[in-house]
Swiss-Prot record:
GO terms for molecular function: imidazoleglycerol-phosphate synthase activity; lyase activity. One of its GO terms (cellular component) is cytoplasm. The active site is at 12, 131. This is Imidazole glycerol phosphate synthase subunit HisF. Its main location: cytoplasm. Pathway: Amino-acid biosynthesis; L-histidine biosynthesis; L-histidine from 5-phospho-alpha-D-ribose 1-diphosphate: step 5/9. It is an enzyme of class 4 (lyase). It catalyses: 5-[(5-phospho-1-deoxy-D-ribulos-1-ylimino)methylamino]-1-(5-phospho-beta-D-ribosyl)imidazole-4-carboxamide + L-glutamine = D-erythro-1-(imidazol-4-yl)glycerol 3-phosphate + 5-amino-1-(5-phospho-beta-D-ribosyl)imidazole-4-carboxamide + L-glutamate + H(+). Its EC number is 4.3.2.10. It is found in: Cytoplasm. IGPS catalyzes the conversion of PRFAR and glutamine to IGP, AICAR and glutamate. The HisF subunit catalyzes the cyclization activity that produces IGP and AICAR from PRFAR using the ammonia provided by the HisH subunit. Keywords: Amino-acid biosynthesis, Cytoplasm, Histidine biosynthesis, Lyase.
Amino acid sequence: MVLTKRIIPCLDLKDGRVVKGTHFVDLRDAGDPVELAERYNEQGADEVVFLDITASKEQRGAILSVISRAADQLFLPLTVGGGIRTIDDIQQLLRAGADKVSINTSAIKDPSLISDGAVRFGNQCIVVAVDVRRSTAANPDATVIHLPDGTTCWYEVVIYGGSTPTGIDAVRWVQDAEERGAGEILLTSMETDGTKNGFDLAITAAVSDAVSIPVIASGGVGTLADFYDGVTAGKADACLAASVFHYGEFTVRDVKTYLAGRGVPVRL
């Protein structure tokens, strides 16, 4: 059976509201994540990611109420990330109606969160998000990655939104995460994030080769061809994007039609 490649819009939420602008002119409420997610659902999105960037723990109630509304109204898988530090946090989100949770910095700080979460809730619920940056610092144990310009580097895991280097080799970390029970890897390269120049294909392919669980490519989409490159040269199982969808440069349906026309299996 050929697995279809998934297209996943991502919405950044703060206090239960969407923070990045959106182009949909006929929305009743452009800040309502459930209404936006419904729009993506209609366009054929395979799932939606809500990334909660609310700083404080006190405001977690907002995201929980959004999730329960979304779970009631949407019939597509919902992944929620941001601020998840404990098994109790995971349980609250899943109980509210999330299908999966995405853990990032907390997984590096406490890798047992991956294994405990996988045992308690199932591997399929645990997405490990990995933010990476290129490094040429001496690291004899790191996985050497060959870049398109002929140079080499290794990729370092960065945490706290990309601001803090860890010294950890990205390829080793994703293998470790898989061994601990992660069901999926959400990979964002800080080299390409926000550039609209396409995914960082070198590390995406290296990570996809290094693990047997699905890899979601994130960071850098600007054109329809970038999605194609992500699932072919990048070997990713899914592509995540935010601004190109929010600002209406193209729809999820446009992406899938483009991919299908080039022989990529997608759910239309």
